[in-house]
């Protein structure tokens, strides 16, 4: 990056990654004062603030763009230099991806497994709601993101992966207690459901679309674990919207029942990644796309 001292941007990156100046200084093996000075020099060069100094610190819009560029350069550097100096393979290639919890719980790890076993890669998986994974790609925190959004980010491409078919399921006992006469507006209001976090609107969309219930009218537990959704449903704690590929065994055994067999939610998945890729990143995208298209309904 012309005119930019890498050490200055590294300081900004460390403050964001370590969530503060003190830990950033420890990471870089310099003083907090030196970290602060480097960021000030960078801001002076760019003629604008790059860091919002709150707790934890966060980058400004310009800071995000600069960090995105810096992280791309660093990743390419990590990938290319070992090819030039093959004896220097002491550092793994650091690859950060953003994924939704349902993909992680079903097909993503088997898709990446061969690459992780054959390459010297340090994987960092950031798990977010399906609607928020692209934010990580926009900010430059990750090199790729699995999302339900089809819109392409500038400088990136979006490849279709397949469908996630979400079924509304519960244990037989739960069905008997709350839905013995079928699922209706009246019994949905009293039956507990589950959402991943406060950004997860899938549950609300389902009851609004099919049962005309207004947002906020149903009870929902909040659990940030896709695997826990299955356990909560089989334990009879709540009814859940879960991908069919994740619970086929439980359905076959009768541990779970599809309480709305005529109704489901279908969500398309896309792999968003840099348009300019090479080496390991190209291989990663190819493996991920190929596996997903075999594992997911098309």
Curated annotation (Swiss-Prot):
Keywords: DNA-binding, Transcription, Transcription regulation. It comes from Photobacterium profundum (strain SS9). This is HTH-type transcriptional regulator ArgP. Belongs to the LysR transcriptional regulatory family. The keyword Transcription applies. GO terms for molecular function: DNA binding; DNA-binding transcription factor activity. PANTHER family: HTH-TYPE TRANSCRIPTIONAL REGULATOR ARGP, TRANSCRIPTIONAL REGULATOR. Residues 21-40 bind DNA.
């Amino acid at each position: 990056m012309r005119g930019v001292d890498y050490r200055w941007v590294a300081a900004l990156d460390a403050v964001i990654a370590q969530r503060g100046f003190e830990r950033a200084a420890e990471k870089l093996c310099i003083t907090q004062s030196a970290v602060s000075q480097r960021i000030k020099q960078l801001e002076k060069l760019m003629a604008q603030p790059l860091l919002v100094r709150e707790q934890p610190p966060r980058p400004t819009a310009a800071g995000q763009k600069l960090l995105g560029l810096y992280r791309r350069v660093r990743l390419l550097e990590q990938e290319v230099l070992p090819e030039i100096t093959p004896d220097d393979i002491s550092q793994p290639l650091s690859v950060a991806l953003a994924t939704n919890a349902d993909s992680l719980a079903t097909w993503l790890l088997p898709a990446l497994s061969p690459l992780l076993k054959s390459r010297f890669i340090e994987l960092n998986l950031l798990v977010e709601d399906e609607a928020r994974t692209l934010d990580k790609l926009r900010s430059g925190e990750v090199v790729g993101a699995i999302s339900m959004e089809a819109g392409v980010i500038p400088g990136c491409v979006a490849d279709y992966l397949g469908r996630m078919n979400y079924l509304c399921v519960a244990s037989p006992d739960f069905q008997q207690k709350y839905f013995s006469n079928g699922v209706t507006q009246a019994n949905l209001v009293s039956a507990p459901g589950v959402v991943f976090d406060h950004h997860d609107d899938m549950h609300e969309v389902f009851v609004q679309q099919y049962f005309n219930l207004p947002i906020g009218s149903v009870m929902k537990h909040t659990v940030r674990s896709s695997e826990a959704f299955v356990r909560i449903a089989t334990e009879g704690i709540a009814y859940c919207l879960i991908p069919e590929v994740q619970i086929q065994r439980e359905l076959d055994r009768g541990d779970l029942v599809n309480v709305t067999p005529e109704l489901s939610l279908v969500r398309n998945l896309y792999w968003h990644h840099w348009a300019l890729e090479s080496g390991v990143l190209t291989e990663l995208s190819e493996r991920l796309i190929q596996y997903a298209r075999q594992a997911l309904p098309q």
